Amino acid sequence: MRALILLSLGLLRVAVPSPPQVVVYTYKPVVHGEKNTLLCHAKEFNPPNVELQLFEDGNVFSQANQTDLSFESNWKFKLTKFIELIPREDVEYSCHVMYMGKTSIYKLESF
């Protein structure tokens, strides 16, 4: 009986929606004119229906790569979108995160 109660509590925790925690960053410190990787990492979300898109001055990077969706030991998910680029000054880099019908925009702040 105790195992059934613990299982029920665990499933209840999984059933509660949890929005993603998102960070946008570069693999290395930004040096203009040098190749780098722009990443958008979303974690701690459930259910796993999230979409990430990387943008440069409002234009989507259609060739961006994405990791496979995976989950942590707490049954919350994580996903990363990334693209190799040469960062340019005066350009805004951002990640649009679509989750449960809502879009949130996160900007790269390291410039």
Curated annotation (Swiss-Prot):
Q: Which InterPro entries does the record associate with it?
A: Ig-like_dom, Ig-like_dom_sf, Ig-like_fold, Ig_C1-set, MHC/Immunoglobulin
TM ranges: none
Checking Pfam families in the record gives: C1-set
Main subcellular localization, coarse class? Answer: secreted
Instruction: Identify the GO cellular component terms for this protein.
Output: extracellular region; MHC class I protein complex
Locate the Ig-like C1-type domain: which residues?
Answer: 20-111
Signal peptide feature range: 1-17
Q: Does the keyword Ion transport apply?
A: no
- Protein keywords: Immunity, Immunoglobulin domain, MHC I, Secreted, Signal
Cell compartment(s), UniProt: Secreted
Q: Which SUPFAM superfamilies match?
A: Immunoglobulin
Q: Which domain of life is it from?
A: Eukaryota
Q: How does it assemble?
A: Heterodimer of an alpha chain and a beta chain. Beta-2-microglobulin is the beta-chain of major histocompatibility complex class I molecules.
The Swiss-Prot or TrEMBL record describes its family as follows: Belongs to the beta-2-microglobulin family.
As for what it does, the entry says: Component of the class I major histocompatibility complex (MHC). Involved in the presentation of peptide antigens to the immune system.
Name of protein: Beta-2-microglobulin
Q: What is the lineage of its organism?
A: Eukaryota, Metazoa, Chordata, Craniata, Vertebrata
